[in-house]
């Protein structure tokens, strides 16, 4: 007789008084808002480090006792109220007055395409300077309220961890990202169905899932080729940041 194994994950119920933590975890504004990140750190600094400073991952693992006790901690709740007030005020801001002289928020839209975006280590789809620059552009654009969307690729494996073996050689260690722990969600069409798009790839069609994330005021879209109807080769297009060979890189550029 073969035993069946089930994997269960017990998650805490975030108290209504702290429901704003869920909002914070789903907006990459936390990547440049130190006060927002500090709330998670203050709840459980050890877990915060273990989760690689990932708010969504943190909220899935924090103990029920800790979040329940926090609602009775007057000092924490005062800081929580200040952070949420600042967060809501930021999102309510309109376009910076100087931007209005050059762009019409109702009719103009800037589209920014990049192979990587480095906003925060909890969203590992970047490797270096290009990604950090693109991420900083998104943050600055959000602060200014410019009508703007960012478009990139959603990699299952982003930057690698560098380790040194016993012989002094650098060893690259890749970690697969669990999308459920990223501040993203599927894009829906007018019927409320999950949106896929199709791209011609030299004689055949590649299907791509469309995901979206919010970084302050900046809306970001990401494409993901990990769909069963695609060939294994095409599913590799968004498997790893700068992975594969020249052909893979060209396919990534075509998708963008």
Identify the residue ranges that each predicted region occupies:
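Catalytic cores of carbohydrate-active enzymes across secretory and cytosolic contexts
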Residues: 1-256
């Amino acid at each position: 007789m073969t035993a069946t194994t089930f994997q269960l994950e017990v998650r805490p119920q975030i108290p209504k008084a702290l429901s704003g933590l869920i909002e914070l975890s789903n907006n990459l504004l936390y990547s440049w808002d130190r006060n927002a990140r500090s709330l998670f750190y203050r709840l459980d600094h050890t877990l915060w480090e273990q989760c690689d400073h990932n708010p969504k991952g943190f909220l899935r693992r924090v103990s029920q006792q800790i979040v329940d006790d926090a609602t009775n901690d007057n000092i924490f709740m005062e800081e929580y109220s200040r952070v949420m007030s600042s967060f809501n005020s930021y999102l309510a801001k309109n376009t910076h007055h100087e931007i209005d002289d050059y762009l019409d928020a109702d009719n103009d839209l800037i589209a920014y395409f990049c192979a990587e975006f480095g906003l925060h280590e909890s969203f590992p789809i970047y490797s270096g300077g290009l990604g950090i620059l693109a991420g900083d552009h998104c943050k600055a654009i959000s602060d200014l309220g410019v009508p703007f969307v960012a478009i990139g690729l959603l990699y299952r494996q982003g930057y690698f961890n560098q380790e040194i073996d016993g012989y002094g050689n650098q060893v690259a260690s890749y970690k697969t990202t669990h999308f459920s722990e990223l501040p993203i969600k599927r894009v829906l069409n007018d019927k409320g169905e999950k949106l896929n798009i199709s791209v011609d790839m030299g004689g055949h069609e590649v299907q791509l899932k469309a995901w979206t994330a919010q970084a302050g005021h900046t809306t970001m879209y990401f494409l993901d080729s990990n769909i069963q109807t695609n060939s294994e080769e095409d599913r590799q297009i968004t498997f790893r940041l700068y992975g594969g060979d020249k052909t893979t890189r060209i396919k990534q550029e075509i998708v963008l």
